[in-house]
């Protein structure tokens, strides 16, 4: 992720990071702050966010010392963020890059901001879409990833009804940021709650 992001920014492109608004968005923003402090990406590269993730981020920061955290010193707003503008012309200006867009939805459903921005970036070889969640089958995020992987540069993709197909020239990569509890996490919850009965339910359908 670090390498791919740095490469997009180095060539003057914009990196689109589609995220789920609660949990993954805040995790990515904290990580971006760390990458800036480490010098992995430029300190002055702008980071843009939008929507309810900003309100949720405030709650994360306000409760960082009263809820269990790996590092209570990490703050979502510890890294400077700019609000994605509403105006179409202003959006075009910030896409001139370099920059980082952390917006929802993680699956890039239409008409979310992630979908709107992806349609404006997909034909630009300087830009990159970095997927940090599992793109479910049939979603725009999955269609974009499959097109880029299967057919390479110029492969057609339909990201929204009435728009496209568009040729994929931007970088598209997927990174495995797990949002699930591991075995020890699940066991510790059961041990703390000590319930009389535990029901295990899992399945896509």
Predicted feature locations:
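Acidic/His-rich, metal-assisted hydrolase cores and their charged scaffolds
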Residues: 1-205
């Amino acid at each position: 992720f670090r390498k791919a992001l740095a490469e997009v920014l180095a060539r003057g492109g914009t990196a689109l990071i589609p995220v789920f608004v609660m949990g993954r968005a805040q995790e990515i923003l904290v990580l971006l702050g760390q990458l800036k402090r480490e010098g992995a990406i430029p300190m002055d590269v702008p980071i843009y966010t939008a929507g309810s993730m900003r309100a949720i981020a405030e709650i994360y920061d306000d409760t960082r010392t009263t809820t269990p955290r790996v590092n209570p010193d990490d703050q979502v707003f510890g890294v400077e963020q700019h609000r994605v503008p509403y105006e179409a012309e202003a959006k075009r200006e910030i896409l001139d890059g370099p920059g980082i867009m952390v917006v929802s939805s993680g699956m890039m459903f239409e008409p979310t901001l992630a979908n709107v921005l992806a349609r404006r970036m997909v034909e630009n070889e300087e830009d990159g879409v970095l997927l940090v969640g599992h793109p479910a089958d049939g979603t725009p995020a999955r269609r974009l990833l499959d097109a880029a992987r299967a057919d390479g540069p110029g492969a057609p993709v339909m990201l929204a009804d009435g728009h496209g197909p568009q040729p994929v020239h931007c970088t598209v990569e997927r990174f495995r940021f797990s949002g699930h509890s591991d075995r020890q996490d699940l066991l510790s919850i059961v041990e703390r709650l000590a319930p009389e009965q535990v029901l295990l339910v899992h399945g896509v359908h």
